[in-house]
């Protein structure tokens, strides 16, 4: 029974999607320890903080969006809609995640603790943005913009140019793939006055904006290599990333649910893994 409950909660918060969130923050950690001492405890605490913050964000998103989700054929089978998890339990998950997040921050400096409400505010406001702005995808990207600087601030009390560039690359990466994913709901969004770029600009223009966002992502990631003077392994990684982005956008030349899901889940998972590996090898070995 307990295992079934854990499985339901894991599905509710899409725990496996942490694969998208962790690499940018962990890459930031690797860049920081390139110039500072490595600490396994700090690494674990950062991972706990990231996962708990993301859990809060996903739970509160599901809670706030439950009325919209109940009408959307794509989302009406989610756990909160089908009563597999109650609203009370959903709020409890978000509350516990928030407590764990703040406990994990207590080992770091006061600056990151004082700035932490910004992270929570972005997570909390994001679900409402689709009700009033077509830039909702970029508001989601703010989470990834904040994460790398937050890691460095937690460890050093400041943040550097390369960390800011990493956060900015995460912003454009997430904004770009969220625009792609929103194509799945284009008809529903139009009928229900939900704001998204595909519903406003159409599929063709949205794909162009997504592609430009991902080109900027690659440029920013390459710029980190120059700033940090990273070696051959890093540039091989950049080349692979560029190839994966091309593959992702090649998949959505023909728009259908299967291709979009492949582009969103499979390709972005591969991009996340390659990103983390290239930073790990470049900072720890070279």
Identify the function of each model-found stretch.
Residues 1-286:
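Multi-pass alpha-helical membrane architecture of UbiA-family
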């Amino acid at each position: 029974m307990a295992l079934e409950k854990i499985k339901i909660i894991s599905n509710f918060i899409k725990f496996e999607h942490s694969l998208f969130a962790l690499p940018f923050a962990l890459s930031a950690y690797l860049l920081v320890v390139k110039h500072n001492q490595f600490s396994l405890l700090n690494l674990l605490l950062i991972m706990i903080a990231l996962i708990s913050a993301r859990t809060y964000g996903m739970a509160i998103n599901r809670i706030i969006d439950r009325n919209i989700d109940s009408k959307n054929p794509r989302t009406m089978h989610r756990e909160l809609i089908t009563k597999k998890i109650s609203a009370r339990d959903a709020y409890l998950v978000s509350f516990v995640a928030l407590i764990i997040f703040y406990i994990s921050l207590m080992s770091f400096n006061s600056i990151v603790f004082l700035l932490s409400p910004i992270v929570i505010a972005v997570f909390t406001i994001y679900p409402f943005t689709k009700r009033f702005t077509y830039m909702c995808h970029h508001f989601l990207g703010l989470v990834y913009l904040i994460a790398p600087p937050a890691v460095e601030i937690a460890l050093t009390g400041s943040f550097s140019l390369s960390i800011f560039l990493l956060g900015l690359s995460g912003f454009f990466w997430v904004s770009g793939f969220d625009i792609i994913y929103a194509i799945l709901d284009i008809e529903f969004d139009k009928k229900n006055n939900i704001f998204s770029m595909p519903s406003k600009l159409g599929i063709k223009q949205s794909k162009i904006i997504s592609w430009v966002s991902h080109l900027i992502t690659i440029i920013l990631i390459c710029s980190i290599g120059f700033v940090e003077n990273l070696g051959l392994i890093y540039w091989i990684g950049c080349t692979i990333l560029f190839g994966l982005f091309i593959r992702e956008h090649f998949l959505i030349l023909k728009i259908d649910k299967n291709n979009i899901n492949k582009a969103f889940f499979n390709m972005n998972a591969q991009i996340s893994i390659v990103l983390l590996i290239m930073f790990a090898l470049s900072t720890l070995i070279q």
